[in-house]
């Protein structure tokens, strides 16, 4: 039974309930909060997967945090998912193993889940619940923030217009990322998506300064990394990569490993984004948020939904998964009057390489494009194996062009896309009719296809190409074709750029290409 009674329903009146409840409420209102600050219960009536059902609960609130004390003294925390009469359903973040229905005590805190945030969190490693695991001291909180964040007024959002140079040619030239964008990496098991994300972290920087007065010093850049359900090898890879590059002091890691509780994965990305919002909007830093693996997050969501016996949607995922994913992805961007920004790169592994699976399908709806990691390219030893045809950046048009990158950027990108797509068709046709049946134009497209994958897409994991070097490399490939075949580039552009470096080319580099 409950040892004390809460008083958090100040609008409750005795007229609307039975006299006994009304009397309890009056006692709660007049309770001395110094001696009885919180409500404790020993009324666990059932445990179902990650959920605990409490009975005889008075005035429980939706999303309220509950602290559990197990018989051995272990502390766990949970959140109220549903209240029905005197029963409350609580989702336990650290898992329900060891919870005894007779001896476990539950304490209702009367508050939502808040996380301590501070600029000192940079350089620290936390578990999926936000507790330090690097043997360092607890965080001296500057603020305690709601992990669900604050809604941003759409009118105060700034349209992302500053291109981030990643040093990776297929991204910079054909799928340019703007500061404040949310763009996921669609990958699959066994593909080098972690290496690509680490390379972006190492090499990301602005092409040039924008009109606004902002601080572009390196100290003003921070990375928030959240891992959900990853193995120890992946966590160690990112940690060692940050340490080797000397950027660990600007990185905050949240690690929920594969052997950690599944249910903890639901709050891990929200803790990371709350920290990122504090760094971006209070400390005015430019924050890059990497979330991996969003597929593990969605499966944790499905597990809770199944335990609550909700009506399942496609492939057993809950019908509200779209809304839930949006509450994470929409926390990227820039805000008027604040110097910081949040750029999101979620990583998700497509089950069975299926892009129509609900997780990549819904993610593609919400985010502003995607970077598609291709297994066939990976099998041909191409790194990074980015397939540019299904990849997309919806904010690219506003981040490139004269004054931002170079005036030929958009036209070169369109022409490379067109030639690569035609080259793929020719390659498929060659498999049917043979090379002898191809026209001279078809052979040019086939040559372009091979050189595009070998020289443009392929680069080393520590090779950092500027966007201008990548554009020049694109022109070098387009010179395979005569001018009249470059139909996507205006005449004025071909006159200026087509033969611009022809006399300066080193003959050895042409033969190598």
UniProtKB/Swiss-Prot annotation:
Tissue specificity remark: Highly expressed in the kidney; found in early distal nephron, encompassing thick ascending limbs and distal convoluted tubules and in the alpha-intercalated cells of the cortical collecting ducts (at protein level). Expressed in the olfactory epithelium (at protein level). Expressed at lower levels in the testis.
Record key words, sorted: ATP-binding, Cell membrane, Hydrogen ion transport, Ion transport, Membrane, Nucleotide-binding, Transport
Keyword Nucleotide-binding: yes
Database matches in Pfam families: ATP-synt_ab, ATP-synt_ab_N, ATP-synt_VA_C
Keyword Ion transport: yes
Annotated GO MF terms: ATP binding; protein-containing complex binding; proton transmembrane transporter activity; proton-transporting ATPase activity, rotational mechanism
Major subcellular location class: membrane
Compartmental location: Apical cell membrane; Basolateral cell membrane
One GO biological process term: olfactory behavior
Motif (PDZ-binding): 510-513
Binding site for ATP: 394
GO-annotated cellular components: apical plasma membrane; basolateral plasma membrane; cytoplasm; cytosol; extrinsic component of synaptic vesicle membrane; lateral plasma membrane; membrane; microvillus
Subunit (UniProt): V-ATPase is a heteromultimeric enzyme made up of two complexes: the ATP-hydrolytic V1 complex and the proton translocation V0 complex. The V1 complex consists of three catalytic AB heterodimers that form a heterohexamer, three peripheral stalks each consisting of EG heterodimers, one central rotor including subunits D and F, and the regulatory subunits C and H. The proton translocation complex V0 consists of the proton transport subunit a, a ring of proteolipid subunits c9c'', rotary subunit d, subunits e and f, and the accessory subunits ATP6AP1/Ac45 and ATP6AP2/PRR.
Role played: Non-catalytic subunit of the V1 complex of vacuolar(H+)-ATPase (V-ATPase), a multisubunit enzyme composed of a peripheral complex (V1) that hydrolyzes ATP and a membrane integral complex (V0) that translocates protons. V-ATPase is responsible for acidifying and maintaining the pH of intracellular compartments and in some cell types, is targeted to the plasma membrane, where it is responsible for acidifying the extracellular environment. Essential for the proper assembly and activity of V-ATPase.
Stated family: Belongs to the ATPase alpha/beta chains family.
Comment block on domains: The PDZ-binding motif mediates interactions with NHERF1 and SCL4A7.
HAMAP family in UniProt: ATP_synth_B_arch
Name this protein carries in UniProt: V-type proton ATPase subunit B, kidney isoform
Organism of provenance: Mus musculus (Mouse)
Upper lineage: Eukaryota, Metazoa, Chordata, Craniata, Vertebrata
């Amino acid at each position: 039974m409950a040892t004390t009674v809460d008083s958090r329903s100040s609008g409750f009146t005795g007229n609307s309930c039975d006299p006994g409840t009304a009397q309890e409420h009056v006692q709660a209102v007049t309770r001395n909060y110094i001696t009885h600050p919180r409500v404790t219960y020993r009324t666990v009536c059932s445990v179902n997967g990650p959920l605990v059902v409490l009975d005889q609960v008075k005035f429980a609130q939706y999303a309220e945090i509950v602290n559990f004390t197990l018989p051995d003294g272990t502390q766990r925390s949970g959140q109220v998912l549903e209240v029905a009469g005197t029963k409350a359903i609580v989702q336990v973040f650290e898992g329900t193993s060891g919870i005894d229905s007779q001896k476990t005590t539950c304490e209702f805190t009367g508050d939502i889940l808040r996380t301590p945030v501070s600029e000192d969190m940079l350089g620290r490693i936390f578990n999926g619940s936000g507790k330090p695991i690097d043997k360092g001291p607890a965080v001296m909180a500057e603020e305690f923030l709601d992990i669900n964040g604050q809604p941003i007024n759409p009118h105060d959002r700034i349209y992302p217009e500053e291109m981030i140079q990643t040093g990776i040619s297929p991204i910079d030239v054909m799928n340019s990322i703007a500061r404040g964008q949310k763009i996921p990496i669609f990958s699959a098991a066994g593909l080098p998506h972690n290496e690509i994300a680490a390379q972006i972290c190492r090499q990301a920087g602005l092409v040039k300064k924008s009109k606004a007065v902002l601080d572009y010093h390196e100290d003003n850049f921070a990375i928030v990394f959240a891992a959900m359900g990853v193995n120890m090898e992946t966590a160690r890879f990112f940690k060692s990569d940050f340490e080797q590059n000397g950027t660990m002091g600007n990185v905050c890691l949240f690690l929920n490993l594969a052997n950690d509780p599944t249910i903890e994965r639901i709050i891990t990305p929200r803790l990371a984004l709350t920290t990122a919002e504090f760094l971006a909007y209070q400390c005015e830093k430019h924050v890059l948020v990497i979330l991996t693996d969003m597929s593990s997050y969605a499966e944790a969501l499905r597990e809770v939904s199944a335990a609550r016996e909700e009506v399942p949607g496609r492939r057993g995922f809950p019908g509200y998964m779209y809304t839930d994913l949006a509450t994470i992805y929409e926390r990227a961007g820039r805000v008027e009057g604040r110097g910081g920004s949040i750029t999101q790169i979620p990583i998700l592994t497509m089950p069975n390489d299926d892009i129509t699976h609900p997780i990549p399908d819904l993610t593609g709806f919400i985010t502003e494009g995607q970077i598609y990691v291709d297994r066939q390219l990976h099998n041909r030893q191409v790194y990074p194996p980015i397939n540019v045809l299904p990849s997309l950046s919806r904010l690219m048009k506003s981040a490139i062009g004269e004054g931002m990158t170079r005036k030929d950027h958009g036209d070169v990108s369109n022409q490379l896309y067109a030639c690569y797509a035609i080259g793929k068709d020719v390659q498929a046709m060659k498999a049917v009719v043979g090379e002898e049946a191809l026209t001279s134009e078809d052979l040019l497209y086939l040559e372009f296809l091979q050189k595009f994958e070998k020289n443009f897409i392929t680069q080393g994991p520590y090779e950092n190409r500027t966007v201008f070097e990548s554009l020049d490399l694109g022109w070098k490939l387009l010179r395979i074709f005569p001018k009249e075949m470059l139909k996507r580039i205006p005449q004025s552009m071909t006159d200026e750029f087509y033969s611009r470096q022809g006399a300066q080319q080193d003959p050895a580099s042409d033969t190598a290409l």
